């Protein structure tokens, strides 16, 4: 992944893009301007993997799954014409390929940002010793946290495009807000907290494994149902630890840091409001999502419904 950061800046960026953005004060941060080409490369990297999934990895897998479902699970409706059935099959085939490719990139990016974030956070010399004060946590920047912001922004820029093409408006908004938040981090402003809040991504692998399990594993298999159950339990534990316990603790710490530096010259009121509002909304949503997980788990335990039946009802 480091090779993406070492690629040279395209001539178009040097002569046209960066001067245009800088001269019109569209982007004032030198850190963002100097890393704009790396953000572009990261976005392209994710899109190449998306195209790999869409055209190479998933077509045969999706065809096998749909044919398997037709043979074992789906009762044919005699009133439905073969033409309508073919149209429905094609629509489902295309949709599943696209969504599978999106989830592949979601899984890939979580691995990438977790690698860089954990590498930073688990090194006391990098993440603890230089950040003993509120001032350092809000205003300090270094290449490690800068790189984390670059990979996050590159992914969310790609996410805006892909959500516009294949998803719904709320996902586009999520991508825009996330891009803005990490651009604020790259400015730099609270750059230290970029890897801290990316610990939310610890729940992402289990979330994507769950999606792939529901879509591709034989639901009548007891072994596959057990795998889904174990993954769901892992998801709940990690989700609570990373997004609820860790998330609320860190937003409290961030509020304290902002309060401590509120009178310093570099304190940015608007950026602070955007970051706090975005994080509070996300933390509240995490509580709502976790309560939904708990209610589904309770339904499985109390009513004895199988995991696959419950997850089908969720879709």
Curated annotation (Swiss-Prot):
Keywords assigned by UniProt, alphabetized? Endoplasmic reticulum, Membrane, Transmembrane, Transmembrane helix
Signal peptide positions are: none
Q: Could you tell me the Gene Ontology terms of the biological process aspect for this record?
A: lipid homeostasis
Question: Any idea where the TLC domain is?
Answer: 95-302
GO CC terms of this entry: endoplasmic reticulum; endoplasmic reticulum membrane
Q: Which residues lie on this side of the membrane: Lumenal?
A: 60-101, 166-170, 247-264
Compartment(s): Endoplasmic reticulum membrane
How does this protein lie in the membrane? Multi-pass membrane protein
Annotated transmembrane regions? 39-59, 102-122, 145-165, 171-190, 226-246, 265-285
Organism domain of life: Eukaryota
Q: Does the keyword Endoplasmic reticulum apply?
A: yes
One Pfam family from the record: TRAM_LAG1_CLN8
Write out the topological domains of type Cytoplasmic: 1-38, 123-144, 191-225, 286-315
PANTHER family linked to this entry:
AAR085WP, CT120 PROTEIN
The miscellaneous remark of the record is: Present with 1920 molecules/cell in log phase SD medium.
**Which named protein is this?**
Uncharacterized TLC domain-containing protein YPR114W
Species assigned in the record: Saccharomyces cerevisiae (strain ATCC 204508 / S288c) (Baker's yeast)
